[in-house]
Amino acid sequence: MRILVENGRLLDPSRELDVQESLWIEDGIICEKQAFSANQADRVIDAAGGWVVPGLIDLHVHFRDPGLEYKETIETGCLAAAHGGYTTVCPMPNTKPSTDCPEVVKEVLDKASVACGVHVLPVGAVTVGQKGEQPTDVAALKEAGIVAISED
């Protein structure tokens, strides 16, 4: 599929890019230069007045899964994130049970692997059960896949 995004402000801090120009996407891959004309595009998006940016990262989300799924699941949280332009999220450990052991980290990552394509990078708890008493095994949590620790 060929998509042309026109009239947007392209922003990419990693490339020091801040320009008003078109963006061409072919089969899900951004093209470096004009790859096709507007009449060859399957879809044309007018981004006038908007920004076109790389995927956003939310370092502090509350998915509440496992244990409090009636508030938010990993799937619904990922869908909401994707709709908002986020490609990566870091769910806080304040779930039931909290993300304080490798088994819970694995559960979160397993659920995230079948969600909507948003990268989920779990945050581990600082203390067991988030009770502020016994420290978690941060090395084991890191090995399981956490990217940070928090008591939130």
Regions found by a protein language model. Give the residues of each.
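Divalent metal-coordination and catalytic microenvironments
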Residues: 8, 23, 28, 49, ...
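Conserved residues at the C-terminal ends of beta-strands
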Residues: 11, 92, 152
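Short coil/turn connectors at secondary-structure junctions
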Residues: 1, 40-42, 48, 52, ...
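Short, glycine/charged-enriched secondary-structure capping and boundary segments
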Residues: 19, 39, 70-74, 103-106, ...
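Histidine-rich, glycine-flanked metal-binding segment
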Residues: 1-55
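Histidine/acidic-residue-rich, glycine-tolerant segments that coordinate divalent metal ions
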Residues: 95-107, 111-152
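Metal-associated gating/positioning segment near the N- to mid-region
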Residues: 47-112
